[in-house]
Amino acid sequence: MTVKITGFADEIAPELTAQIAGLKGLGMSYVEMRGVDGENLIYHTDEKVEQIKKTLDDNGIRLSALGSPLGKILITDDFTPHFEEFKRAVEISHKMECPTIRMFSFYLPQESDPAAYEGEVFDRIGKFVDYASANDTLLLHENEKDIYGAMAPECKKLMDTFYGDHFKAIFDFANFVQCGQDTLEAYEMLKSYIAYIHVKDALKSDQSVVPAGYGDGNVAVILKRLSASGFDGFLSLE
């Protein structure tokens, strides 16, 4: 398995200079950029984005993806302003020379049946994918608690409908554990669609996040299966 290591440097520090120091100290040359200098990358001005890009370039660090919050609004919220944020994120991804964006499939009302909102979810995701396709951008869907794609069956429905050059899957061990989803079952269901891994683990007992391999995510087993499959994407440390 030939993989590249990346990670969320805003868990080192909020400031870009400290993030870069931490990454270089770990021998890392990629970052999945989320928060930087006080807010998510997609909310910065063009001038600030250019400054961030130059600083990263000067230090030999590249983006593996934009760790955006896109799709992290209620499915009942107004989509129009959110879609404008999405278009801005696509623009920034190209400015950063990394047209790859982590995103989600919308929070659902508490204790609701995902099927009840499937039509609206798919309509919104379809608009994202159409725009991404027209603008040569890859969207990476992350399984996450309380969204439509929290469990493997719903993630597979999304992939069966939208998977392609512009829509692929992130596999997050801890998020599946925290949702009560068996990760081995999820992996077998989604393995054909996975392009990116979030290396994070959790305990079923209390849902606490623990170092990879110390929880119930079957991290070692799944990474071995990925290796055997020829996976060559990013492993992102979180």
Where are these regions (language model features)?
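Boundary/entry segment of secreted carbohydrate-active catalytic domains
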Residues: 1-14
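A short, Lys/Arg-enriched amphipathic alpha-helix followed by its capping loop at the start of a domain
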Residues: 2-5, 22-28
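Acidic/histidine-rich catalytic cores of soluble enzymes
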Residues: 5, 30-33, 63-66, 127-216, ...
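Active-site acidic/histidine proton-transfer and metal-coordination neighborhood
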Residues: 14-21, 25, 55-58, 74-169, ...
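Short, conserved active-site loops that position catalytic residues or coordinate cofactors/metal ions
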Residues: 26-37, 64-70, 104-105
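A structural motif
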Residues: 28, 33, 61, 93, ...
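Glycine-rich, proline-tolerant flexible connector loops at the mouths of alpha/beta enzymes
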Residues: 32-56, 106-112, 207
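Short acidic/histidine-rich active-site segments
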Residues: 234-238
